[in-house]
A protein has these predicted regions:
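ATP/NTP-dependent adenylation/nucleotidyl-transfer catalytic domains that generate, transfer
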Residues: 1-133
Length: 133
């Protein structure tokens, strides 16, 4: 029907900690905000005059019957993740990260490494031509 699935993941969720379901909310054709940090999405939302109720809503994946937020599940705030991602993108040695961020850095790395498979394309096994015939 000439349609595409548009993703809603931001850079922190999609390429930082991989906080999405690979073939669920990660199964998209285009992801227009995936290069924006969560704070940048908020700034754009305010500039576009998106309803404050939407902007101020607690981020949640909606998979639980309680009120746990993304941040409750992940163990840190989106601001923490952004700070750590910015530090890493600027080439700072992880050993130089401030002591108060070390625990959150460790959580970030744990999530990032566990979910890295979501952030790369599907691996393809190249079959030699002679085996195909």
């Amino acid at each position: 029907n000439n349609s595409i699935v548009v993703g809603t993941g931001n850079k922190v969720e999609d390429f930082g900690i991989g906080f999405y379901t690979k073939y669920g909310d990660g199964g998209v054709d285009i992801s227009p905000i995936a290069d924006l940090m969560k704070s940048e999405v908020f700034k754009i939302s305010k500039a576009l005059q998106i309803n404050d109720e939407i902007i101020d809503a607690k981020p949640t994946d909606g998979l639980w019957d309680d009120d746990r937020s993304d941040e409750d599940q992940i163990g840190a705030t989106y601001n923490d993740w952004e700070l750590i991602m910015n530090i890493l993108e600027n080439g700072v040695d992880p050993d130089e990260i401030a002591e108060e961020l070390k625990g959150k850095y460790d959580i970030y790395i744990k999530h990032h490494m566990a979910n890295k498979h979501k952030m790369i394309g599907i691996p393809i096994c190249k079959i030699p031509k002679e085996l195909k015939s």
